[in-house]
UniProtKB/Swiss-Prot annotation:
Catalyzes the initial step of the lipid cycle reactions in the biosynthesis of the cell wall peptidoglycan: transfers peptidoglycan precursor phospho-MurNAc-pentapeptide from UDP-MurNAc-pentapeptide onto the lipid carrier undecaprenyl phosphate, yielding undecaprenyl-pyrophosphoryl-MurNAc-pentapeptide, known as lipid I. This is Phospho-N-acetylmuramoyl-pentapeptide-transferase. The gene is mraY. It is a multi-pass membrane protein. GO terms for cellular component: plasma membrane. The keyword Transmembrane helix applies. GO terms for biological process: cell division; cell wall organization; peptidoglycan biosynthetic process; regulation of cell shape.
C-alpha cells in the first residue's frame, strides 16, 4: 500500500525490507498473547503422538496449536503495507503461503476434532500439495524470468542445465519435499522456526543479490528482474518468524502446527526456485534433510530387520533419548543450521 504511493524512499529495497520485518515482528508481539488466549479458550490444543518421547505427554499437554495463523497473519498485514502487491513473484509467494497454510489448517482441525495425531489422510494431503505446487510452479514457469528453467550449480561458474518443461515437476518435488521435511522437524520448542529464520535470512541475501544487476554480474549469478519484492516478502516472513519464536521458545506458549510447518517449508522452497538456488537450497535446508533421512532410514531398516538404527526418529528425538535436554537439542541444531547457511552463502563467491 505504501509502495503504491510512489514515495522515493519506498523505492529502496533495504528500507522496505527492514520495515516489513520490524512491522511483522511488532505486530506479532502485540496480537500474539490475544491469539494464544483465544486458541486456549477454543481448546485448540496440540495433539501429542503416543509413540513420541514420554515426557512430552506431560510437558506439552494443553499447549495451543495452529500458531501458523499468527505467523502468516502478521506477514500478510506487513506485506499489504510494504510490498508491491502487483508483482508476479509476490503473488506466487502469497498463493503458496495461503494454499499450504490452508492445507495445514485442515490437518490441524481434523486432529483436534478427532483428538488423535492422525489428521488429514496422507493421500489427501499429498494431493493437495501436488495441486498447490503445480499451480505455483507452473505460474512461475510461464511468468518468471528467462532463467526460470535453468539449474545452476555451486562452485561452477558457467555450467547450467536447462530442464525446459521438466522444470515444473522438478520444482514441485522441491516444494513438496520442503513442506514435508519442515513438518517432520517441527517437534521441539523453537526448533523448526529457529532453523527457518536462518534459512530465511540467507535467502534474503541471495534474493537481494539476484535483484541487483551489478552484484549478479560480479558474482556470476542470474539477475532476476522483479525479485526485489521477494526480499520484502522474506523480510516480513523473518519478522513474523521472530515474533512467533518469542512465544514458541522453550517453554512454548504456542505451537505452529501443520498450519505453520507445511507452509513454511513450501514458502522457502518457492523462494529458492525464484532466485535459482535450487541446489543451494539443499545445503541451506541440510538439517531438515538429515531429519527426513533419519525417518526414512529408520522405517526401511525396521521393515527389513525389525531393528532400529535410532532410538527414535526424527533425529531430534534420538538425541532426547540419549539424554540431551530439549534446549540442548534445539540450540545445537540451530548452530548446525547456521553452519550450513554459511557454507551455502560462501559458494556464491567460490565459482
Amino acid at each position: 500500500m505504501f509502495y503504491l504511493l510512489g514515495l522515493r524512499l519506498l523505492k529502496y529495497i533495504t528500507f522496505r525490507m527492514a520495515y516489513a520485518t520490524i512491522f511483522a515482528f511488532l505486530l506479532s508481539l502485540i496480537i500474539g498473547p490475544h491469539i494464544i488466549l483465544r486458541l486456549k479458550k477454543l481448546r485448540v490444543d496440540q495433539v501429542l503422538r503416543e509413540d513420541g518421547p514420554k515426557r512430552h505427554l506431560s510437558e506439552k499437554a494443553g499447549i495451543p496449536t495452529m500458531g501458523g495463523i499468527l505467523i502468516f497473519f502478521c506477514v500478510f498485514i506487513s506485506l499489504v503495507f510494504w510490498s508491491n502487491i502487483l508483482n508476479v513473484y509476490f503473488l506466487i509467494m502469497l498463493f503458496v503461503m495461503l494454499g499450504f497454510a490452508f492445507l495445514g489448517f485442515i490437518d490441524d482441525f481434523l486432529k483436534i476434532k478427532k483428538k488423535t495425531s492422525d489428521g488429514l489422510k496422507a493421500r489427501f494431503k499429498i494431493y493437495g500439495q501436488i495441486i498447490f505446487s503445480f499451480i505455483s510452479v507452473g505460474t512461475l514457469y510461464y511468468f518468471g524470468s528467462e532463467h526460470v528453467s535453468m539449474i545452476y550449480f555451486p562452485f561452477i561458474k558457467s555450467f547450467r542445465i536447462d530442464l525446459g518443461l521438466f522444470y515444473i515437476p522438478f520444482g514441485m518435488f522441491i516444494l513438496i519435499s520442503a513442506s514435508n521435511s519442515f513438518n517432520l522437524t517441527d517437534g521441539l520448542d523453537g526448533l523448526a522456526i529457529g532453523l527457518s529464520i536462518v534459512i530465511t535470512g540467507a535467502l534474503i541475501i541471495i534474493a537481494y543479490l539476484t535483484s541487483r544487476a551489478d552484484f549478479a554480474a560480479y558474482l556470476h549469478i542470474p539477475n532476476i528482474k522483479g525479485s526485489e519484492e521477494l526480499v520484502i516478502f522474506l523480510g516480513a516472513l523473518l519478522g513474523g518468524s521472530f515474533g512467533f519464536l518469542w512465544f514458541n521458545a522453550y517453554p512454548a506458549k504456542i505451537m505452529m502446527g501443520d498450519t505453520g510447518s507445511l507452509a513454511l517449508g513450501a514458502i522457502l522452497g518457492m523462494a529458492a526456485l525464484i532466485v535459482k538456488s535450487e541446489i543451494l537450497f539443499s545445503i541451506l535446508a541440510g538439517v531438515f534433510i538429515i531429519e527426513t533421512m533419519s525417518v526414512i532410514i529408520q522405517v526401511m531398516v525396521y521393515k527389513k530387520t525389525k531393528k532400529r538404527v535410532f532410538k527414535m526418529a526424527p533425529l531430534h528425538h534420538h538425541f532426547e533419548e540419549l539424554g540431551w535436554s530439549e534446549m540442548q537439542v534445539v540450540i545445537r541444531f540451530w548452530i548446525i543450521g547456521l553452519i550450513f547457511a554459511i557454507i551455502a552463502l560462501s559458494t556464491i563467491k567460490i565459482r
